[in-house]
């Protein structure tokens, strides 16, 4: 945790002066990346928010299947024979997903003079009017007949025209983006994808999500360019080919070589812009800083082998040899835990040093191109190979700065190493605390939620996983499962998991946060903020990372110097993570609420007892958010705090979430918002507000 240093309040205008005029903006629409802050306690003003969304990515050809959603029920989309042997779009197969609709749709007033509490830092979408009768998802609802799942027309969710939809991305931002716009596009695409997974869309999910976003103007960096792409950083990862297309990293939907068209070449000159490796073609080899890339083509329309020709992408790569221009390289790798899932790693700028021809295994001519990585770039593919060796060869104790093999001492299913690469001679371990893998139940019972104990437990599931709408636990989640393949589908005011009275098995899809770590996490020493937490594994947006475990406290019990305190009453920066109904031709009132309004303040201290969650530091631009989880055990109801990935997170990236601030005030002189926290923030984000807690 960040070191505690008393500080003075910092005006918000010092951080983002452009935001001050937007305080009264209607937050029911989607900001590009800015929206007001939330808190439990009303205040006289409404603060601004400065939180980036998340990144998301996917592929766009016949093999566009969603690893989260499973294969299309209609089978692959046929396309014409390609000259491109480097078509690296991937297949991903998994069962179709489910998703969530909120039970508690408590939403703040549009009155900008009031703040509202946002547990995970989520925006309100305005009040939702409902007719009289039992609220949707009511705990005492007893359906008289089995519910039938809604059947969707595959064409009813496909956008044909933009209409009056405002993507809030200007023409200039569409052509040339920035970090904020790229994050927004990736987040919004993935939210649509998750929604399509939830309803088991019968056609290709990724193609539908991509097409809708493109037609509705949710895209950026459409101008083709040589060199760096604004808003995209070396080391960024993408789970789907088409994500790279939406944010302008790789514009070719099918080919592994992206190059200027004939018309563009007349202006820019013929050259290659980006290549994506597949790691599966003859003669293609990959070193940490070099790449031998196979040319494209080599088959006719019937799939028969033939000589590759010096045209298209091959001609562009040849031109880049003499031109000496930068070429972006994206490495396609197999997911470490899902053999049918690919991940794409942006590895930075390369130069095409030479090319030659060989006779391939088919007996026909093939081209080879050698690309060399430019120096002084952050490591990307090299980090992937390092953690791959750690996972596969168990080299923990031989690592630089190794201190302890397992900080949990066997309490977790996966070991939690402790390393200090900042000072290898310092073998000090974190201060004394008892490691607990999950929340201590004592004091965590949610007496505030008065459940009918006779209705607890999904008795009608009969020892089968909860997969149908007649399950009482599914009904509490709005008739849809909250997770799919261990991925959170929507943020909600509260998520209900199966508990002790439920006869469903331990592998039930609604039992996630209770079942412990599923990622290879490690605790490491940071340069400025003490101990931190990171993962060996790539993390997809929505992935459960860990629980924040500790002891439930009252205000009176909290110690002044407790740096390991989780507090739901803080003011959190808001961001939008759930999908926009308009991007799927749904009514705006169907928006799933992200506003969290717990009936009482929740304080959890991990100072004396805790798990890896206690080592997750604060950031004003976090990559993790928190979500309240409720479950029942032996007739009592308990509240847990789950920490989930906000966006795709590359391996060995520090995991951070927003700790919140104590209050936000408006200065009397110039109406500038002031964020007041007790500790100086050292997160280093461009949107750092200067303080926290």
Swiss-Prot record:
SMART domains the record matches: PreSET, SET, SRA
Residue ranges annotated for the YDG domain, each copy included: 227-373
Residue ranges occupied by any SET domain in the UniProt entry: 519-660
Catalytic function, reaction form: N(6)-methyl-L-lysyl(9)-[histone H3] + S-adenosyl-L-methionine = N(6),N(6)-dimethyl-L-lysyl(9)-[histone H3] + S-adenosyl-L-homocysteine + H(+); L-lysyl(9)-[histone H3] + S-adenosyl-L-methionine = N(6)-methyl-L-lysyl(9)-[histone H3] + S-adenosyl-L-homocysteine + H(+)
Binding-site residues, Zn(2+) 4: 620, 681, 683, 688
Gene3D superfamilies the UniProt entry points to: SET domain (2.170.270.10), SRA-YDG (2.30.280.10)
Sequence similarity: Belongs to the class V-like SAM-binding methyltransferase superfamily. Histone-lysine methyltransferase family. Suvar3-9 subfamily.
The protein, known as: Histone-lysine N-methyltransferase, H3 lysine-9 specific SUVH7
Organism annotation: Arabidopsis thaliana (Mouse-ear cress)
Organism placement in taxonomy: Eukaryota, Viridiplantae, Streptophyta, Embryophyta, Tracheophyta
């Amino acid at each position: 945790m960040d070191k505690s240093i008393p500080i003075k309040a910092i005006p918000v205008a010092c951080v983002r002066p452009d935001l001050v005029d937007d305080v009264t903006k209607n937050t029911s629409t989607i900001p590009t990346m800015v929206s007001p802050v939330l808190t439990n306690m009303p205040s006289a003003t409404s603060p601004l928010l400065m939180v980036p969304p998340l990144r998301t990515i996917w592929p766009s050809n016949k093999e566009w299947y969603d690893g989260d959603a499973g294969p299309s029920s209609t089978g692959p989309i046929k396309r014409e024979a390609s000259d491109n042997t480097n078509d690296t779009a991937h297949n991903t197969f998994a069962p179709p997903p489910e998703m969530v609709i909120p039970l508690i749709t408590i939403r703040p007033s549009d009155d900008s003079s009031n703040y509202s509490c946002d547990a995970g830092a989520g925006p309100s979408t305005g009040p939702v009017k409902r007719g009289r009768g039992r609220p949707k998802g009511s705990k005492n609802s007893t359906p008289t007949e089995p519910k039938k799942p809604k059947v969707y027309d595959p064409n009813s969710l496909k956008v044909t025209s933009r209409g009056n939809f405002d993507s809030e991305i200007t023409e200039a931002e569409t052509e040339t983006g920035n970090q904020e716009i790229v994050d927004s596009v990736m987040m919004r695409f993935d939210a649509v994808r998750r929604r399509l997974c939830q309803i088991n869309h019968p056609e290709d999910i990724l193609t539908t999500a991509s097409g809708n976003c493109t037609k509705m103007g949710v895209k950026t960096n459409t101008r083709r360019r040589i060199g760096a792409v604004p808003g995209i950083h070396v080391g960024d990862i993408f789970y789907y080919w088409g994500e790279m297309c939406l944010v302008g990293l790789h514009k070719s939907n099918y080919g592994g070589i992206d190059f200027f068209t004939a018309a563009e070449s007349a202006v820019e000159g013929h050259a290659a812009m980006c290549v994506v490796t597949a790691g599966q073609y003859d003669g293609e080899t990959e070193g940490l800083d070099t790449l031998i890339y196979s040319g494209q083509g080599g088959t006719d329309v019937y799939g028969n082998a033939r000589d590759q020709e010096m045209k298209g992408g091959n001609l562009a790569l040849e031109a880049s040899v003499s031109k000496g221009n930068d070429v972006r390289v994206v490495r396609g790798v197999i997911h470490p835990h899902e053999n049918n899932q690919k991940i794409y790693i942006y590895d930075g700028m390369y130069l095409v040093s030479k090319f030659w021809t060989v006779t391939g295994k088919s007996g026909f001519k093939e081209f080879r191109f050698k690309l060399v990585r430019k120096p002084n770039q952050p490591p990307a593919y090299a980090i992937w190979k390092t953690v791959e060796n750690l996972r596969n060869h168990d080299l923990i104790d031989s690592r630089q700065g190794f201190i302890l093999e397992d900080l949990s001492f066997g309490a977790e299913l996966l070991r939690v190493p402790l390393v200090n690469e900042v000072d290898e001679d310092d073998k000090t371990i974190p201060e004394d605390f008892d490691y607990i893998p999950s929340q201590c139940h004592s004091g965590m019972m949610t007496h505030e939620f008065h459940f009918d104990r006779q209705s607890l437990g999904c008795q009608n599931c009969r020892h089968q996983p909860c997969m149908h709408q007649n399950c009482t636990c599914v009904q509490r989640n709005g008739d849809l499962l909250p997770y799919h393949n261990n991925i959170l589908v929507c943020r909600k005011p509260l998520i209900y998991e199966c508990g002790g009275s439920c006869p469903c098995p331990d592998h039930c899809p609604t039992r996630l946060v209770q079942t412990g770590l599923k990622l290879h996490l490690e605790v490491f020493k940071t340069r400025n903020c003490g101990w931190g937490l990171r993962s060996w594994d790539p993390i997809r947006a929505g992935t459960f990372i860990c629980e924040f475990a500790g002891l439930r406290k009252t205000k009176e019990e909290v110690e002044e110097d407790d740096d390991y305190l989780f507090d739901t009453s803080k003011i959190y920066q808001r961001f939008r993570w759930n999908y926009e109904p308009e991007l799927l031709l749904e009514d705006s009132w169907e928006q799933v609420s992200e506003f969290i309004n717990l009936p009482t303040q929740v304080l959890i201290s991990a100072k004396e007892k805790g798990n890896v969650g206690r080592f997750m530091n604060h950031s004003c631009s976090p990559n993790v958010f928190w979500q309240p989880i409720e479950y029942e055990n032996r007739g009592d109801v308990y509240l847990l705090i789950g920490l989930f990935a906000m966006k795709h997170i590359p391996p060995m990236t520090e995991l951070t979430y927003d700790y919140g601030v104590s209050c936000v005030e408006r200065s009397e002189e110039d109406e500038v918002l002031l964020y007041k926290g007790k500790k100086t923030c050292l997160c280093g984000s461009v949107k750092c507000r200067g303080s926290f807690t």
